[in-house]
Amino acid sequence: MEQQLSTENNQLSSEEILGLLPHRFPFALIDRVIEHVPGKKAVALKNVTINEPQFQGHFPERPLMPGVLIVEAMAQVGGIIVTQMPDLPKGLFVFAGINNVKFRRPVVPGDQLVITCELLSIKRQRFGKVKGEAHVDGKLVCSGELMFSLVD
């Protein structure tokens, strides 16, 4: 996936995101990128709807977005940063680990996650670390550090 950001205002549509990330339904979790500084930072939106498959079982009487999917959405925003770095080798960067992740509030259908990720480090052009935060209505719902690795 070698597409470079082409919009003047540093936003990406869902179609452009599909050109950058390998994720597809039901794991394409980013709806739109609303701010992007290539190689440094990205801010994206995830609209949480009752139609998502996880809500059939998590939990039918009180649907809550699973924390692992919030973290995965943050990782995908981090992936947007990594895919836009021209000095890195092309290939598949995968989620390799998490540190200090905290869940602070539930996320429910009807919420809009505003996810911000900032690049913390890149090592040997193969490993990366980003700081991620997810907010709903201006309130922090999840934060942590996410690691990436290039798969040969």
Swiss-Prot record:
Gene3D superfamilies: Hotdog Thioesterase. The active site is at H58. NCBIfam families: fabZ, PRK00006.1. SUPFAM superfamilies: Thioesterase/thiol ester dehydrase-isomerase. Involved in unsaturated fatty acids biosynthesis. Catalyzes the dehydration of short chain beta-hydroxyacyl-ACPs and long chain saturated and unsaturated beta-hydroxyacyl-ACPs. GO terms for cellular component: cytoplasm; membrane. It catalyses: a (3R)-hydroxyacyl-[ACP] = a (2E)-enoyl-[ACP] + H2O. Belongs to the thioester dehydratase family. FabZ subfamily. It is found in: Cytoplasm. Its EC number is 4.2.1.59. Transmembrane segments: none annotated. Keywords: Cytoplasm, Lipid A biosynthesis, Lipid biosynthesis, Lipid metabolism, Lyase. This is 3-hydroxyacyl-[acyl-carrier-protein] dehydratase FabZ. GO terms for biological process: fatty acid biosynthetic process; lipid A biosynthetic process. GO terms for molecular function: (3R)-hydroxyacyl-[acyl-carrier-protein] dehydratase activity.
